[in-house]
């Protein structure tokens, strides 16, 4: 059989490659590298002379040649052509090129675990997935991140978990020992925690089961559901080793029966708070929570105080086809979604199982939360400085609503799609990791509390409460962009399940805080229950908030709303410039107690002005506002009035005048203004200089003082002279006269005068005669 030359060449090339692979022998190509002096012209001349092709410079005087007559791959070098060319004096070095084995140093290859190809939610080229492969390709697999599963224990010796098991992230709270191994039963009741653990950190490439999303993360477990669950048990679990554990994943909560309203008690609530404020060295523990499986009972996850907490990252479920599962609960506190089980024809979740087995039938929102915990571990590996709130911001900004089917998608005030069934959409691991790498930590959390009701309100068939809110810039509770919003309500109602409650933000986002629950016949109402929504994330809180409470039944129900406290959480990191009008002012609704001005403006009569008017001067005042029983300090640039005697001033006292009003004189010595008399109000003649005028006006107080003193002395002397003349006729006589009307004394005479001179003889006689007359009159009156 005749073979064409091209076919023979191809076969020879393939044979060369095969020999190379088997023996490791060198394979020579039809290219050379040469060091030739004389420039490109000389290199071209030599190539033409010996049949080479010049492919150009490699770098200075070094050229890349090839030869058509030489096979592209050969096991032996072509020495003849090389020797001939090398004899040329301009050729300093020549070498036939050898094919080298080089492999791409990819950091990612698909896991080889036998069940990996069944993990459709990790990698599905036909439909949407969680984009986990994109995160792996960026080099993140959870290394250095610690996740603990709060559940019924973890099978620490499972072959697909053992290599990643972390005893420091584990404990048995039920039996008070360090071993979280589940209690085995015939029904395998305590498999839940082991299944959740495998979703997060099942080991990769070990030939067992599938792979965890964060397959290099450390995984632990807390056995706390296999016994009496108390407030203390929950608190100890939530607070386990908070500076070692980064992420806590919980797929449990109160009964999903459509009638229960329950949440963390005092100790658990304190554990949450301590976790987010002290965990991870102050960055905050991250709590991932399953939103609940009460969909068939028309339950609301806003009646679950764990998923409804601002401290938890609440995760819902969607099916393989992107539909709302039959078990899913809708509520406004859900932040995002991952995949889980659906109808019978839809696939479920692959993970580790009890008794060192593997399962492909993990279901419910119990399966969704650990997938989210794994993705969060990847993001945390990309940036270990993320706070607990940073992580929620990343989830909001990167979650993808595409492909998720629901009839309640809306676009909120900042242009994001959000749903009560899905939150902001499907978690996207690749996008989260990419954003996490360059994420800048958000500003400190701020809290603004407004007590809305001044008196109880009858609910009746429907009740609407409106309130304009304007958080004030410069105050510690000022918020420019929202995160969580809570409506803390207390109300009585004879059938709680007939109520629907909505909250509409100033930017028009309407959150369903409570959907009707047909199985809830309770007459207990709500007692200071916090309904939370994430749907207004990043919106501006300023403006009118509207609370609606509606009786959806035809029954004549009755009840009273006794408390409505609006609690806003967010940041002031957006900057204040966009908050002010063009004139530097920020006006406040009349119901508010404050107004603030941009830097460079001054507060004056509830408006902002560039400079203070005449009669006022600028000042910084520490004003205290009373807000919801809290006294908040605020430093304000204000215009304060001058003293009444000043026209303009530098302060508020009488000695801070800069200029005086008309008909007043300015005193340069004490910077005061003195009001002129009517006589002195004549204008100075034109020939008088302003200096002479000021001098005269400044001497006036001294002249007035001197004249006043002289006047007082004259009056005093006149009175003294008059009294002296009346008492004795001359100044030298110091006598007292006894008259019928009594003793007349001059109080200015020293008391020593009575002792210096006694009575005269005539005065003694007059006194005796007077006494006799007095005695005679008394005797006559007696008769």
Swiss-Prot record:
<feature type="binding site">
    <location>
        <begin position="290"/>
        <end position="293"/>
    </location>
    <ligand>
        <name>substrate</name>
    </ligand>
</feature>
<dbReference type="GO" id="GO:0010008">
    <property type="term" value="C:endosome membrane"/>
</dbReference>
<feature type="binding site">
    <location>
        <position position="160"/>
    </location>
    <ligand>
        <name>Ca(2+) 1</name>
    </ligand>
</feature>
<keyword id="KW-0472">Membrane</keyword>
<dbReference type="GO" id="GO:0005576">
    <property type="term" value="C:extracellular region"/>
</dbReference>
<dbReference type="GO" id="GO:0005886">
    <property type="term" value="C:plasma membrane"/>
</dbReference>
<dbReference type="GO" id="GO:0000139">
    <property type="term" value="C:Golgi membrane"/>
</dbReference>
<keyword id="KW-1133">Transmembrane helix</keyword>
<feature type="binding site">
    <location>
        <position position="299"/>
    </location>
    <ligand>
        <name>Ca(2+) 3</name>
    </ligand>
</feature>
<keyword id="KW-0479">Metal-binding</keyword>
<keyword id="KW-1015">Disulfide bond</keyword>
<feature type="disulfide bond">
    <location>
        <begin position="301"/>
        <end position="331"/>
    </location>
</feature>
<dbReference type="Pfam" id="PF00082">
    <property type="entry name" value="Peptidase_S8"/>
</dbReference>
<keyword id="KW-0165">Cleavage on pair of basic residues</keyword>
<feature type="topological domain" description="Lumenal">
    <location>
        <begin position="106"/>
        <end position="701"/>
    </location>
</feature>
<feature type="domain" description="P/Homo B">
    <location>
        <begin position="442"/>
        <end position="574"/>
    </location>
</feature>
<feature type="binding site">
    <location>
        <position position="210"/>
    </location>
    <ligand>
        <name>Ca(2+) 1</name>
    </ligand>
</feature>
<feature type="short sequence motif" description="Cell attachment site">
    <location>
        <begin position="496"/>
        <end position="498"/>
    </location>
</feature>
<dbReference type="InterPro" id="IPR009030">
    <property type="entry name" value="Growth_fac_rcpt_cys_sf"/>
</dbReference>
<feature type="domain" description="Peptidase S8">
    <location>
        <begin position="119"/>
        <end position="433"/>
    </location>
</feature>
<feature type="binding site">
    <location>
        <position position="262"/>
    </location>
    <ligand>
        <name>substrate</name>
    </ligand>
</feature>
<dbReference type="InterPro" id="IPR006212">
    <property type="entry name" value="Furin_repeat"/>
</dbReference>
<dbReference type="InterPro" id="IPR002884">
    <property type="entry name" value="P_dom"/>
</dbReference>
<feature type="active site" description="Charge relay system">
    <location>
        <position position="192"/>
    </location>
</feature>
<keyword id="KW-0732">Signal</keyword>
<feature type="binding site">
    <location>
        <position position="152"/>
    </location>
    <ligand>
        <name>substrate</name>
    </ligand>
</feature>
<feature type="binding site">
    <location>
        <position position="177"/>
    </location>
    <ligand>
        <name>Ca(2+) 2</name>
    </ligand>
</feature>
<dbReference type="InterPro" id="IPR032815">
    <property type="entry name" value="S8_pro-domain"/>
</dbReference>
<feature type="binding site">
    <location>
        <position position="366"/>
    </location>
    <ligand>
        <name>substrate</name>
    </ligand>
</feature>
<keyword id="KW-0378">Hydrolase</keyword>
<feature type="repeat" description="FU 2">
    <location>
        <begin position="636"/>
        <end position="679"/>
    </location>
</feature>
<feature type="signal peptide">
    <location>
        <begin position="1"/>
        <end position="24"/>
    </location>
</feature>
<dbReference type="InterPro" id="IPR015500">
    <property type="entry name" value="Peptidase_S8_subtilisin-rel"/>
</dbReference>
<feature type="transmembrane region" description="Helical">
    <location>
        <begin position="702"/>
        <end position="722"/>
    </location>
</feature>
<feature type="binding site">
    <location>
        <position position="206"/>
    </location>
    <ligand>
        <name>Ca(2+) 1</name>
    </ligand>
</feature>
<dbReference type="InterPro" id="IPR008979">
    <property type="entry name" value="Galactose-bd-like_sf"/>
</dbReference>
<feature type="binding site">
    <location>
        <begin position="189"/>
        <end position="190"/>
    </location>
    <ligand>
        <name>substrate</name>
    </ligand>
</feature>
<comment type="similarity">
    <text>Belongs to the peptidase S8 family. Furin subfamily.</text>
</comment>
<dbReference type="InterPro" id="IPR023827">
    <property type="entry name" value="Peptidase_S8_Asp-AS"/>
</dbReference>
<dbReference type="GO" id="GO:0140447">
    <property type="term" value="P:cytokine precursor processing"/>
</dbReference>
<feature type="active site" description="Charge relay system">
    <location>
        <position position="366"/>
    </location>
</feature>
<feature type="glycosylation site" description="N-linked (GlcNAc...) asparagine">
    <location>
        <position position="551"/>
    </location>
</feature>
